[in-house]
Design a protein with these regions (language model features):
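Active-site metal-binding core of divalent-cation-utilizing nuclease and nuclease-like domains
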Residues: 1-22
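Mg2+/Mn2+-dependent nuclease catalytic core
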Residues: 32-51, 58
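Helix N-cap / beta->alpha transition motif
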Residues: 45, 77-85, 109, 132
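Nucleic-acid nuclease catalytic cores
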Residues: 53-86
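Short, electropositive alpha-helical surface patch
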Residues: 77-104
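Charged phosphate-binding loop/patch that engages nucleotide di/tri-phosphates or the phosphate backbone
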Residues: 106-151
Length: 151
């Protein structure tokens, strides 16, 4: 496969990352007007999954996707890479599961993001939104610490 001349090729492993209270948060950002985000390689690229999965191997790193569902009302959810991979495997292979909501074998719907993810609180301003990422990071650190202490 050859790229067209002048085609942009990302050299970054993540769309963005935050550092907060000694933790690193690598994020892949996905936005849609639909009620689900497709697993299509055009939308979620294999190297994005690979890099997030690799990051999950290290302490104090909480990697995942930020899924923005713009319509009918703007909602954003963080889904940890491990939770995403578990869901994707169950959905694509039609395995038995304990999800309360219906699964879709080719995408992750907003209802599953609500169930397995953490909502990013936001406030609508005149034109744009303000996202409360400090609150999100605090919530994710607490979840991480609880899962580590449970083991």
């Amino acid at each position: 496969m050859f790229l067209k001349r002048g085609a942009a090729v990302s050299k970054n492993k993540y769309d963005c990352f935050l550092h907060f209270k000694g933790y690193l948060f690598p994020f892949e950002l996905k936005s849609t007007k639909n009620k689900s985000v497709s697993f299509s390689e055009k939308i979620i690229k294999p190297q994005q999954i690979k890099h997030l999965k690799e990051a999950a191997q290290y302490p104090n790193i909480i990697p995942g996707f930020l899924f923005q569902f713009r319509e009918p009302e703007n909602k954003v959810y963080f889904v940890h890479i491990n939770d995403f991979l578990t869901y994707k495997n169950i959905a694509e292979n039609q395995l038995s599961h304990t999800y309360k909501n219906k699964i879709n074998k080719s995408s992750i719907p907003i209802s599953i993001c609500e169930e397995i993810g953490t909502e990013v609180r936001l406030m609508k301003k005149k034109v744009n939104y303000t996202y409360y990422l400090n609150k999100l990071c605090d919530d994710l650190i607490k979840k991480e610490q609880q899962s580590v202490s449970a083991v």
